Amino acid sequence: MTTKPTIAISHLGCEKNRIDSEHMIGLLVNAGYEVDANEELADYVIVNTCSFIEDARAESVRTLVELAEANKKIVISGCMAQHFQEQLLEELPEAVALVGTGDYHKIVDVIQRTEQGEIVKEVSQEITYIADETVPRYRTTNEAVAYLRVAEGCDYRCAFCIIPHLRGDQRSRPIESIVAEAKQLAEQGVQEIILISQITTNYGKDIYGKPKLAELLRALGGVDVPWIRIHYAYPTGLTPEVIAAMRDTPNVIPYLDLPLQHSHPDILRAMNRPWQGRVNDRIIEDLKKALPDAILRTTFIVGFPGETEEHFQHLVDFVKRHEFDHVGVFTFSAEEGTPAIDLPNQLPQSVKDSRRDALMEIQQPIAARRNELCVGQTVDVLIEQENPATGELIGRSPRFAPDVDGLVYVTGEASLGSIVPVQITAADIYDLYGTIVEA
């Protein structure tokens, strides 16, 4: 009997990529392959790459080169495989296969073909696949947290974004499928489910004829998971129905990740954002009135072609005025295959960097003030880590999403994966500190 090769998976990029990796692991394990976390011990390494911006591509390339130098058989999957295809096979002879973003479910067949000596290119030009609750999945997050993909792809064509080219048009899963997977996750002991897609507020539009996020949230209210968090909510999609569903569904956290990208109408129009110039004060003010306890995270792009000092100052004033809880700032990255790469008035990197640094400097005291409002409160904290040297516990309250926001450093005793009441005693720019409240 032939021994099956050992396989490792190197995951790079976003949560959507993570879910693809988790499905590949699940499928391979089901097929009898040993999946090892140690790349040095593996015969094959699947590198699930990111190609969203230049920095992400550089990280993917570094990983591929290091593995090639270690003489590993490399399977390149994900966004770079979709983006560059034959170019990767030509430049990296150690690559034995390419697997596109709509083809990860074929990973077992791909490995079997490479074992026979074939160089495999499994990259669909029309990307239509989305995994459901029946596809094996091995989660790589900590046991208490899981990402749940409600849709894949995007129907918008923002000038700076290559995602529709890499992941296809939007395709949503039926509500019943999502609820079924949420119940599976609850049975596994998951305490927090994070709903993701490219534009979560557009969920269902492609299969139901109109967005159905409100109905999905209400359906998920019946699942025994304490926290459900929404990522990537477009402000114009936060309809009264969605806001009412958030208010009425106790396990839906009032946390909103709003990818606003800019405030000035000129720049929003140049970006071809779906709301064009309609991100204004009223939208944010109405949202805060409707959800007064909402935790608001947003991201901005500075240095977009044609952004003047006046445009940038408009954004600075917008950030000062609305005091978001969490802000991420990215410099514009000109991506091949997007309209923005050909726009006039491209800005030097030095200007982009200085604007990013200036905006973050303005946001930091705002973030500190928002965190300081928690001092004296008792908040629920999901315990995720323990510092073995000090015994200090580390977790997150509802105001912090994994990886992108802060942490809560906790004194006291609690089991990993449990949610406990913590009295907040101190705060800084990013994190909170507190003590477990004994019952």
Swiss-Prot record:
E.C. designation(s):
2.8.4.4
Can you supply a Gene Ontology BP term from the record?
tRNA modification
Supply one GO molecular-function term: metal ion binding
**Which note does the record give on the cofactor?**
Binds 2 [4Fe-4S] clusters. One cluster is coordinated with 3 cysteines and an exchangeable S-adenosyl-L-methionine.
Q: Describe the location of the Radical SAM core domain by residue ranges.
A: 140-369
This protein is called what?
A: Ribosomal protein uS12 methylthiotransferase RimO
Catalytic reaction annotation: L-aspartate(89)-[ribosomal protein uS12]-hydrogen + (sulfur carrier)-SH + AH2 + 2 S-adenosyl-L-methionine = 3-methylsulfanyl-L-aspartate(89)-[ribosomal protein uS12]-hydrogen + (sulfur carrier)-H + 5'-deoxyadenosine + L-methionine + A + S-adenosyl-L-homocysteine + 2 H(+)
Q: Which cofactor does it need?
A: [4Fe-4S] cluster
* Binding residue positions for [4Fe-4S] cluster 2: 154, 158, 161
Please state every residue range assigned to the domain named MTTase N-terminal.
Answer: 5-116
Classification via HAMAP family = MTTase_RimO
